[in-house]
Swiss-Prot record:
GO terms for molecular function: naringenin-chalcone synthase activity. Belongs to the thiolase-like superfamily. Chalcone/stilbene synthases family. It holds the Pfam family Chal_sti_synt_N. InterPro entries: Chalcone/stilbene_synt_C, Chalcone/stilbene_synt_N, Chalcone/stilbene_synthase_AS, Polyketide_synthase_type-III, Thiolase-like. The keyword Transport does not apply. The primary product of this enzyme is 4,2',4',6'-tetrahydroxychalcone (also termed naringenin-chalcone or chalcone) which can under specific conditions spontaneously isomerize into naringenin. It is an enzyme of class 2 (transferase). Disulfide bonds: none annotated. This is Chalcone synthase. One of its GO terms (biological process) is flavonoid biosynthetic process.
Amino acid sequence: MAAGMMKDLEAFRKAQRADGPATILAIGTATPPNAVDQSSYPDYYFKITNSEHMTELKEKFRRMCDKSAIKKRYMYLTEEILKENPKVCEYMAPSLDARQDMVVVEVPRLGKEAAAKAIKEWGQPKSKITHVIFCTTSGVDMPGADYQLTKLLGLRPSVKRVMMYQQGCFAGGTVLRVAKDLAENNRGARVLVVCSEITAVTFRGPSDTHLDSMVGQALFGDGAAALIVGADPVPEVEKPCFELMWTAQTILPDSDGAIDGHLREVGLTFHLLKDVPGLISKNIEKSLVEAFQQFGISDWNQLFWIAHPGGPAILDQVEAKLNLDPKKLSATRQVLSDYGNMSSACVHFILDEMRKSSKEKGCSTTGEGLDVGVLFGFGPGLTVETVVLKSVPLLD
């Protein structure tokens, strides 16, 4: 009897799991309507924060913006909103309540906009969504943004939710890792993944004693990305664009304090050490070897690349360290140029850009004609997320 029960349990456990790997079935993105031109941003930023008397600092900030490789960003914070909330414009003024009032509404709202696009592309009824993963570094609330999104979209009350607050820029990889595990261990699961980021928590006036804060003011933008992740796609109905083959997370050695953020009365403060690009480029090959030796790949130019664009210096140093063909990071640099650093949402914007540009260029796969690729998330810790992706053939 015990043997029979064990056999039944094994069959039950096997029946719970999917047969194939997790796949990305749809991608949707959204930004606030307010677009900010990077070339004129220093003038606007110093004017709106009443800092025009700080002429040397303004020139330093202008150089930061010029070197950012960003042409445009999108921001929820308009001139009108900032004039109504002068404490948000000051450097280190108590302003958390005002910031929270903005983001607890706007983060799920922007997430809903991206999610609606992903659900439409997916083409299945939203009642088939079994899990929700919501990620944001913008504010904290209870019930969380996952709950608000569920209500806004009209998802089933029994949908299984995971909420990730305060993860930072590596979390675009984290959500894929968690979604993969959910999809592959729950047969028929369809996971709605949403990353929504609003810079209202980090915006503040300039300071000549906190230049790393100004780096953030020059780089960060607002955006939300949504994915549908599931295994065993329904033939002729669901159309995968990438497969999630393997994932890892690691803390880089000797990187304590390299990137950190603290939620205080003044909002979310960010601290960056100058050597962040060096730390990442020095350690990235180890992550690549760990990920790809099982696939027999050691030429990093054989891969398609999605790297979180923390800033141009990180991309430049990674490119140099690995002797990458400059075209490898073209999708990554395009998103940085068009949107800035949107924290966790960035890598999903890059996935979307890659599959679309691959189709436009007539490539044979969603991964620029290549079969296997890598997605990297870099963030506080210094934490690195690695995701091995398989592209999907593009049919004529």
